[in-house]
Amino acid sequence: MNEELIAKNFHHPPWHLHGDAFILNYWLTPNFIKSNQAFQLAPSPIGRVIQIMLVRYHKSPVGPYDELLILDHPLMSKRHLSSIPKIYVSTPASVMNGQRFWGIPKQLAQFEWVIKDDVVYCNISFQQQEMSLHLQKYKHSQTFYINSHHIPAQLLNIHQTWQGLHYQFSPQFRGKLCKLKQASWKNTLDIFPDFSQAKYLQSFYVPEFKLTLPSAKMNKK
């Protein structure tokens, strides 16, 4: 790919994105974290809560795309910032821009969706391996408004390291969310931690949101 074509595929921040998402909350034990060291989860002697996000971006500067990521939250006593240690997306343009502008280690995967009433199935394929996620919404669930200003700033202060650079940025978002009934995983194999072995906490469906990704502060390692 020549330099001119590469330049056309880059869209400088800030980015403004719209979509819907599932936010899955899990409590991880120290043993779970140790057994999944390959996914770059920060160690913890007592365990902690992390989030998994499955997102469908309907509008973005690079067009619609799907995303599955781990959002690993800080250990307050050690002043670790939040990070995204593992992430898959469905388009090459999202991979290129995420790596370049935010240091996010995006990898290209295929997403297939099946939606039947209040049940959502998502199959994710990467390097000839396929995993599936089954999500069940409540038929009738109260919707709440959420804004990033309601969340402690440290939780949204994301720090990434990529190709010799440190990136730091704080996304801003607003939207609506409702409680999710259930989430189950199958065949995570080597491409994602098996969160069926972690403690599932109250999770949420976000039927609509608006997200802003600002420019990241960048420093050399």
Q: Model-flagged regions — what are they?
A:
Residues 11-12, 16-18, 58, 73, ...:
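Histidine (H) residue identity feature
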Residues 1-67, 76, 80-82, 199, ...:
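N-terminal domain-onset segments
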Residues 24-26, 52-54, 70-72, 87, ...:
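Generic structural hydrophobic/aromatic packing signal, biased to beta-strands
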Residues 55-130:
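Aromatic- and glycine-enriched beta-alpha-beta binding-site module
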